[in-house]
Curated annotation (Swiss-Prot):
It is an enzyme of class 3 (hydrolase). One of its GO terms (molecular function) is four-way junction DNA binding. Its EC number is 3.1.-.-. It comes from Monkeypox virus. The keyword Cytoplasm does not apply. Binds 1 Mg(2+) ion per subunit. This is Resolvase OPG149. Keywords: DNA damage, DNA recombination, DNA repair, Hydrolase, Magnesium, Nuclease, Phosphoprotein. SUPFAM superfamilies: Ribonuclease H-like.
Amino acid sequence: METSTSSSQSLIPLPMSKKDYSSEIICAFDIGAKNPARTVLEVKDNSVRVLDISKLDWSSDWERRIAQDLSQYEYTTVLLERQPRRSPYVKFIYFIKGFLYHTSAAKVICVSPVMSGNSYRDRKKRSVEAFLDWMDTFGLRDSVPDRRKLDDVADSFNLAMRYVLDKWNTNYTPYNRCKYRNYIKKM
């Protein structure tokens, strides 16, 4: 099952074609077999535009499906969530790196998950909260499907937004490393 949210809305609306070389196209993957997710953002002239947020399915025929997902845009940067050494999902990372090595000028970067500290459940909850806050900011909250399992798309979106904000040297509180036991989101 593949669901997708695409939008031409941004903080500052700008017309854009698929091959606009003055912009940067950032793709972030939350890796997994049953619930991988992809976010594609365009960064141009200090504005960010959400091009696509998709929940993907790589459970069968994963090589063809990943190749299809990678061929939809001309990315300048591809972000992959770092996996533990013996994870069964490491094969996806190597496949993506190999696929883009000769076919694209995109940089492929493995990054740590955005949320850290506390329990797995707490990290996922904070990730979804930050994602929904960003969807409100972009005016896309109505496009987000009502479902319980939003943490995969939230993680991919937060990977992409953290990358953009780091490039702009912008601090966003939910993305800060939190060592406190009782993290309370204050915005």
